[in-house]
C-alpha cells in the first residue's frame, strides 16, 4: 500500500525507562515541529515496556498505546526506537522490525558491537535505515555530517575524543 504525505509515520518505542520515557515526551511535545520538518504527520503509536504501570509517572504517554507486547510494537511501526538495552531480545526485536519494513533508531552499543553486521545486512536487504548516532561518541553529531555533508570528500582520518564521559571530565 502506497503512503501519501498525509499518512502519519507510525513511531514505536521499545522501552519506557529513563531514556525511553523522555524520548516519548519529546515526540509528543514536539509532534507539530517534527511533522513540519519531516513533511508528514508523525504519531507515537506504541510504547512497549515490561512494567506498563510504571508509565503512569509519565503523563505525556497515552496509556492506550502502552503494552508488554514488544514484538507487536516492533512489527507495526514505520520507525522503531529501540531503547531496551541488552543484546538477545533487542536483536530479535530489531530484526523483526527491519523484516516488517521499519527503519530503526538505537542507542544500544552492545547490540551494534555484537550484531552490527547482521543488522546492517538485514536493513540493506529490506531497504530501510539504521540510525545509531546516540550510541557513539556521547551523541556528538559526527556521523550525519560524514554521511551527508562530507560525502564528496575523502576523509582519511578523524582525531578527537569521542566519548561523552571523557569529554565531560576534560571540560571540567
Where do the model's predicted regions map?
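Rossmann-fold NAD(P)-binding glycine/threonine-rich loop
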Residues: 89-100, 109-148
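N-terminal glycine-/serine-/threonine-rich beta1-alpha1-beta2 phosphate-ribose binding loop
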Residues: 2-100
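Conserved anion/nucleotide-ligand pocket segment
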Residues: 148-172
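Short acidic, glycine/serine/threonine-rich loops at helix termini
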Residues: 24-25, 57-60, 116-119, 141-148, ...
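Short glycine-rich anion-binding loops that position phosphate/pyrophosphate groups of nucleotides
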Residues: 85-87, 110, 163
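A short hydrophobic/small-residue beta-strand
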Residues: 104-105
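Glycine-rich beta-alpha junction loops
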Residues: 48-53, 136-138, 161-167
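Active-site catalytic pocket residues across diverse enzymes, especially alpha/beta-hydrolases
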Residues: 27, 31, 123, 150
Amino acid at each position: 500500500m502506497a503512503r501519501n504525505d498525509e499518512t502519519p509515520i507510525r513511531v514505536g518505542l521499545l522501552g519506557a525507562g529513563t531514556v525511553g520515557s523522555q524520548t516519548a515526551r519529546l515526540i509528543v511535545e514536539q509532534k507539530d515541529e517534527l511533522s513540519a520538518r519531516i513533511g508528514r504527520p508523525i504519531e507515537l503509536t506504541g510504547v512497549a515496556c515490561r512494567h506498563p504501570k510504571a508509565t503512569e509517572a509519565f503523563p505525556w504517554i497515552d496509556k492506550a498505546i502502552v503494552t508488554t507486547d514488544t514484538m507487536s510494537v516492533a512489527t507495526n511501526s514505520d520507525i522503531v526506537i529501540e531503547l531496551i538495552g541488552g543484546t538477545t531480545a533487542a536483536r530479535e526485536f530489531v530484526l523483526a522490525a527491519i523484516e516488517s519494513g521499519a527503519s530503526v533508531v538505537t542507542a544500544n552499543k552492545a547490540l551494534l558491537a555484537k550484531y552490527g553486521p547482521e543488522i546492517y545486512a538485514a536493513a540493506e536487504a529490506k531497504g530501510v535505515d539504521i540510525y545509531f548516532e546516540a550510541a557513539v561518541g556521547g551523541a556528538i553529531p559526527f556521523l550525519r555530517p560524514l554521511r551527508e555533508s562530507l560525502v564528496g570528500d575523502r576523509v582519511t582520518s578523524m582525531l578527537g575524543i569521542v566519548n561523552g564521559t571523557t569529554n565531560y571530565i576534560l571540560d571540567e
